[in-house]
Amino acid sequence: MRNVGNYYINCECGKETSFTAAKSYMSQTVIALLFAAVLSHDEKVLEQIKKAPDIIEQSLCKNIEEQVKKSVPLFRNVQDILLLGRGFSYAVANETELKIMEASYTNAKAYSSCDYPHGPIATTNRFIPVIFFLTDEKTNDSTIKLVEKIKKDFSVSTLVVTIMKNILQWLTKRV
């Protein structure tokens, strides 16, 4: 590889043993973020990158796996899953689409939540559950409105993946 490009960065993640390429994907994502932070001289981002292992460990210690296991029955016997996100969350939805298809052989399709109401929503039906990714406080309101519309108009089962600790309180405040 050293002879292919002018420069070479080893991900240092070891041999990839997962068919979903989880280690290499996460390592390459961190390298891309690190590259952008160094290029822009953004010390805040560099500090956040250094905290990432602790943040991931903390997330896993807070019953995240149990929450995931509780939501899985909703998706167990479906043939299709929709994933919606906006901004950074759209990239997460796209990667989740691949991981779901590779790991479970379930058809999955990711859309931008701001584009979805303008065409793809016509394919929505109550037999296809939707996973929403909410991480951007600037766009959460419009995405929550889309969650509510899809649930009301199509009786679709939904899962919301969010960084918001008190999403129910937040929803109550915006009404």
For the regions a protein language model found, what residue spans apply to each?
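A SIS-like phosphosugar-recognition module
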Residues: 1-175
